[in-house]
A protein has these predicted regions:
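Short glycine-rich substrate-engagement loop in P-loop NTPases that contacts/grips substrate
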Residues: 51-76
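P-loop (Walker A) phosphate-binding loop of NTP-binding proteins
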Residues: 25-26
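N-terminal pre-Walker A segment at the start of P-loop NTPase domains
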Residues: 1-13
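Conserved P-loop NTPase "ATPase switch" module shared by AAA+ and STAND
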Residues: 80-98
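Hydrophobic anchor at the beta1->P-loop junction of P-loop NTPases
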Residues: 22
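Hydrophobic positions on the alpha1 helix immediately C-terminal to the Walker A/P-loop
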Residues: 33, 37
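Conserved glycine(s) of the Walker
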Residues: 29
């Protein structure tokens, strides 16, 4: 599976939006695959929840939404290498108090560089989702402008991208 992901990372260089989402059920091997890519490309993985969370702790809660984008931009600029950014644990981006649209945020980053991100949701019927309907952080998106890379069977095989 790492070979297919490596090829995809090389192939998306010429696309307008260079966003690849690793999608699969919990414990399917998404993070392990991202770590493999990190080791092969010598690019660190940005743990968004830990890194951004630590930065936001220094900002008063009433002002965090004003600083989240700038802090995240600084973190991604520090972490990206050779036009490649690897992201994991992005759940914090869905925090409603930050007033972010996580997918649009990722797509904006993917115009300037290739972004490979573990998606903490699912894709079904051509729709990308995070959370369950009725949950306060539930999000539902179309898949235009991104490349889904589905992982199933505990990471042992991948399903063709939609």
């Amino acid at each position: 599976m790492i070979e297919r992901l490596e090829k995809l990372v090389d192939d998306i260089t010429s696309l307008n939006s260079k966003l690849v989402l690793l999608i699969g059920p919990p414990r399917s091997g998404k993070t392990a695959l991202l770590v493999q890519l990190s080791q092969h490309r010598n690019v660190p993985v940005l743990n968004v929840g830990a890194a951004l969370g630590q930065q936001l702790l220094m900002v008063p809660s009433t002002r965090r939404h004003l600083h989240a984008v700038g802090l995240m931009k600084d973190l991604t600029d520090e972490t990206a290498r050779e036009g490649l950014l690897l992201l994991d644990n992005i759940e914090l981006l869905f925090d409603r108090t930050l007033l972010l649209n996580p997918l649009d945020f990722l797509k904006r980053h993917a115009h300037a560089r290739r972004v490979i991100c573990v998606w903490p949701g699912e894709v079904r019927d051509g729709r990308l989702s995070y959370g369950r309907a009725g949950h306060p952080e539930y999000q539902d998106y179309g898949i235009n402008g991104l490349v889904p890379f589905e992982i199933s069977d505990g990471g042992k095989r991948d399903v063709d991208a939609l």
